[in-house]
Design a protein with these regions (language model features):
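Short beta-strand/loop motif that positions the catalytic acidic residue
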Residues: 217, 223-225, 229
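Short beta-strand element of the alpha/beta-hydrolase
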Residues: 33-41
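Catalytic nucleophile-loop/oxyanion-hole region of alpha/beta-hydrolase
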Residues: 43-45, 72-106, 270
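N-terminal cap/lid segment of alpha/beta-hydrolase-fold proteins
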Residues: 1-30
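Short alpha-helix in the alpha/beta-hydrolase fold that links the catalytic acid
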Residues: 219, 233-242
């Protein structure tokens, strides 16, 4: 695999409901071999994946990372979504923009945590848009049970006070064993810790539908999971993987890794596996 330097650009487009969606793109110096669209997790933003994007360009891929609505430099109330489908609409537009820039090459969608759920849900609903799905620690079920009272409140308020805001309760120390990753996350002004009542009920709906719809997946699938994930339940990832109908599916469990496998101590093996998987499918 030839290694090349990359060019970085920023842009924005109008997503669902007229919301401005910010994105970044990294291009290899030569002709791109394939498009990789990156979907980030809850409360974070696309720039946290710049190291992965840069890594991909060295192997000739072009990477496109959007900030989901209510996140990072995109518009919308922080941590809010009217409908989970709005995330899918935005991702779909990002894919179309990337394809317009790079016609005739394959497109892969890679999602992390909430982005893994978004990516899997998108792949089930719009299979013709993609040539492969990569989901890392997809948010199919939380490791810590959400208290029943919180679930009840969210369901009640979703209809009458949809933007009622609550703390995600996400513990940054469970992201990675790499203290520098945790420190940067905590100090990042674009990271937030909030979700709304409507977001929660839409998230639950998407979790259920994505788990049930796994047998719709016939495209190449790479599922990545940290074995010691304390945020997302690895058994849910395993259950999802087993339901995938694709004849080309791979589950990689990294023993002892926390939630963010690609930000872990030892992430080089994960990135290497990602390159190898992509290179074999273009």
């Amino acid at each position: 695999l030839s290694k090349t330097s990359s060019q970085h650009t920023e842009g924005s487009f109008e997503g669902a409901r007229g919301t401005q969606i910010f994105y970044q793109t990294w291009k290899p110096s030569g002709k791109a071999k394939a498009i990789v669209v990156i979907a980030h997790g809850i409360g974070e933003h696309g720039a946290r994946y710049a190291h992965i994007a840069g890594h991909l360009t060295r192997f000739g891929f072009t990477a496109w990372a959007l900030d989901h609505r209510g996140h990072g430099r995109s518009g919308g109330k922080r941590g809010h979504v009217e409908s989970f489908d709005d995330y899918l609409t935005d991702v779909g537009q990002m894919i179309r923009i990337a394809k317009d820039h790079h016609p005739g090459i394959k497109t892969f969608l890679v999602g992390y945590s909430l982005g893994g759920l978004i990516a899997a849900y998108f792949a089930e609903k719009h299979p013709s848009e993609l040539d492969g799905l990569i989901a890392s620690g997809p948010a199919l079920r939380e490791k810590m049970k959400v208290p029943a009272v919180k679930v009840f409140l969210a369901k009640t308020l979703s209809g009458i006070m949809p933007t009622f805001t609550n703390n995600t309760g996400l513990d940054p120390n469970l992201l990675s064993h790499d203290k520098e990753v945790v420190r940067k996350y905590v100090e990042d002004p674009l990271v937030h810790k909030v979700v709304t009542a409507r977001w929660f009920t839409e998230y639950r709906r998407a979790q259920n539908e994505t788990m049930q719809g796994a047998e719709k997946l016939t495209m190449p699938c790479l599922i990545i999971q940290g074995g010691a994930d304390g945020i997302i339940d690895p058994s849910a990832t395993n259950e999802f993987f087993k339901k995938i109908k694709s004849s080309d599916k791979t589950l990689k469990v990294y023993e002892g890794f926390y939630h963010e496998s690609m930000n872990e101590v030892g992430k080089e093996s994960v990135l290497g596996d990602l390159d190898t998987w992509l290179a074999a499918r273009i």
